Amino acid sequence: MLYRKENLNIESKVVGDITYNIISFIRGRSVVEPQLCFVLVYAAHIALTNNVNDADDLLSFIEENVSEQRAMFVKEVARDCIEVSLQLSKMFSDKDFLAYMLVFPRGFAGKLYAESGTPESLSKLANRILDIKENERVADFGSGVGDFITLVSENKENNYFYGNEINSRYCEISRIRTDLFAKNAHVELGDMFAVAGDKKFEKIFSNYPFGMRLINLNAQTDYLESLHKRIPEIKRATSADWIFNSLIIDHLTEDGKAVAIMTNGSTWNSIDQKIREYFIRNGLVEAVIALPSNLFEYTHISTILIVLSRNNESVRLIDSTSICEQGRRQNIITDENIERIIRLLKEEGEEAVTVDFKTLQQNEFVLNPSRYLENTVEIQDGVEFGSLIKSVTRGAQLKANELDEMISDTPTDVQYLMLSNIQNGMISEDLPYLKELNPKLGKYFIGNRNLLLSKNGAPFKVAVAEIEEGRKILGNGNLFIIALDEEKVNPFFIKAFFESEVGFASLKKIVVGSTIPNISLESLKKLIVPLPPMEKQNEIADLYQAKQDEIKVLQLKLEKAHNALRGIFGEVK
């Protein structure tokens, strides 16, 4: 039987009461997790609607009346607590159980289970953007527990809905929910990269996993090989977001439209520039919406909603980061907020801009709205950068032939730092050594914890020097060597800011010159930077340094692995 959402009269208190009672019944006997709660409520629904009053009879009834896979799922998850379902069936109505399964609360369980779903407000926004018409085929790749399909299938009698989910338990929960609330829905267990290539849809949604790289993606080899032949811009370090987006495009009809939720960084980092160029050059990006932070229960990561379709000559960029209702633990996009965002897709406003190919090309094909919407760069607790600086010098202006004469073939206590020695915000350990220097060059030495910022060229490089005692490093002339007042500001906090999208956009505003972009010292000193309390600065700086240390360890492991590869041939006798 198909149940209508509008007939359930959902009350959050009742849903909460069901969860509370389940926790009370099984406290000390089992770990209370959303899957267990859902299955117990599902079994209570079966018991109540079929007048089953015994635990063994309930398990037997389920075994005889549902699919073998579902029966196994129910027994695997809830066999030891099945009597709780009978207790619930005597306390609540079937409408209460249906409301619970429709809402399926997961927030009480933390990160792991919250990852299985999409916030309702995001599903609603995606639904409004997709504007599903009668008879259209709709897919959700990585459908989790079926949040999107359950929501958008309401009153869609003549549409076909398809879900694909690799986690068997999530898939079965999704199937239960679609059986109850969605007509013409089919949820398939499996890898989305293994979906038949000829399976096409007019509308597609995907809230795929965050923070993955191609090298970590356990996707079908055949698909990736085929994809790389078609899109050589894809590299091993490419963000998985763009691999997922490529898959979505492959399953979209010629006139179709898709919405995906992706990470902020993939819209602007240098690693993904070539694949962004491919998508933009081929007219595959219709719009990009920067979403409010803290929408998800399991992460505070900044996210982007991307609209994919074909034959686009420009891209609509919207900054909706402040268009939300702020909650204590989680932000929500209200129905009113959704309508405002929909209007911004079509109408002018301070938070929206349409950008053509040439402008995108001039901006490294960055797709983050803050790059193009100057008014959106807001700095909280802002001060002029110059007020935090003790001194600024430029590195030594050395000619190539002068430098060649100064290079030492043997280690000395003086080394030379060039721009090429700064990669991904870190200074190389293998800097060239210099012979005895003219004392006049001493003023160009870099101090410990000095902030380094490239003056010319793009993208700009930022680093914090960590110099051991007894070691001297001469800076290149294309560097600002900045000694900060560390009683006011943590250098690693400023580095983290400059490397953020907001910080990058702030730096970009003071850049002059198009052929060779450069930053003037005067403009740099007037630049507004955030200055929160030192406690918060240190917290951000510590997180940044910890992640930087993690990268160094990974780089060392990678170097060792490469060295090991060179010796494999000789190991086999």
Please name every model-derived segment.
Residues 215-223, 403-438:
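DNA target-recognition patches
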Residues 112-206, 211-212, 263-265, 275-276, ...:
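Conserved S-adenosyl-L-methionine
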